[in-house]
Amino acid sequence: MTAASPTPASAAALPSLDRLLRLPALAALIEGHGRSRITQLLRSHLQMLRDRISAGQLSTPQLQEAVDGPALVAALDAALAADARLELQPMFNLTGTVLHTNLGRALLPDAAVHAVTRAMTAPVDLEFDITRGRRGDRDARVQALVCELTGAEAATVVNNNAAAVLLLLNSLANRREVVVSRGELVEIGGAFRIPDVMRSAGARLLEVGTTNRTHPADFTHAIGARTALLMEVHASNYTISGFTAKVDTAAMAAIAHEHGLPLVVDLGSGSLCDLASFGLPHEPTVQETLASGADLVCFSGDKLLGGPQAGIIAGRADLIARINRNPLKRALRMDKMGLAALEAVLALYREPELLAQRLPTLRTLSRSQDDMDSQAQRLLLPMRSALAADYSLERAPMHSQIGSGAQPGAQLASAGLRITSARRGGLDRLAKRLRQLPRPVVGRIAEDALWLDLRCLEPADEVAFLAQWSMLQA
């Protein structure tokens, strides 16, 4: 005889919300998460069961099991765990891009983390002058450090470099012309374009020269009664090679000053130290740019500087004063946590010989290929044992990049692990599985392989990394 099909569940058989809340099995969850939260999750669970009943996907025995105490607790635990994953998650960045915009850019040094914790957990003298017992300036400490480190007359800070450019242009060039080389009208991530920012700031863009060649005469001939300033935008996220010509900062400054105009330089990534001293390609520093005659320089805090997201403007005191008087300055200001972190990072630059030890960004960028290759050798066997038989894993030389638009042509000799698969789609499946680990692992797929660049994997994190990797066996 054929066994009878299970009786389809009826919506009328669903228990009431109040009855479920009174179940002894749920008491611990209610105590740990609150009645309101558990009530919300139960409503969602009951609606899911109601939908399955309407679709004919649930039998009476299945419904009875779904609302039984242990099964209900398991379902609520799973829902709570899923909600917890909505938080920002720590990840292992094995992409080979150090300052990865999508992964949060620069990691903060211990000094900055401690400073942020203090600012978060106690009242601080954010805008209070302790000596005089009255209101103070929230930017004062950062301004003093920036001036000390760069030689600038004054400085101010906002919450990112795009905001710095917007504020600067709105303060100095509203309804007036800004002269820029056509080859420097950059677009960075998220379709942020210099011409659009100028328009939003109320400035009128006057582009000169051509994409590949701009000469001093192009700037001289463009200056008129409506000109507010000359602007140089550092081409940090692309390169132009071949038949090219560019007016350097000193020459642009001379032209601007001859006509009584300021020269503004957007350095983008910005650096306060010579990267060549760490074995990296040279990047114009803020100090060099100011010494070349720039009146204002703006740059990011969370890129080569190695700090929190910030936009720093340094230069002439009279121009900084005009910027600070703009009502937009308050709308774009940094919060106390960002200021605390930035102050701590800038303070590290007072002892440049120790930067590579203390600043994660420089420590990571300056790692030797031999160091990473030794790390790959240590990880090879335990990682290989966790992979299925149709995957192959081997050590391999690689090339890292700085990221976040810094030195796009620079290739940093690196090392890591290269995974290939005998099955079609195997690499995509493995990459997805790695992203689903409790602490996701992100590499890059290229040339029929999954590349895991070890530049950003600190030796101190190897045990935690292997613990995640071993979960692939589950």
Q: For each of these PLM feature ranges, what is it?
A:
Residues 94-95, 105-131:
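Glycine-rich phosphate-binding segment of PLP-dependent enzymes
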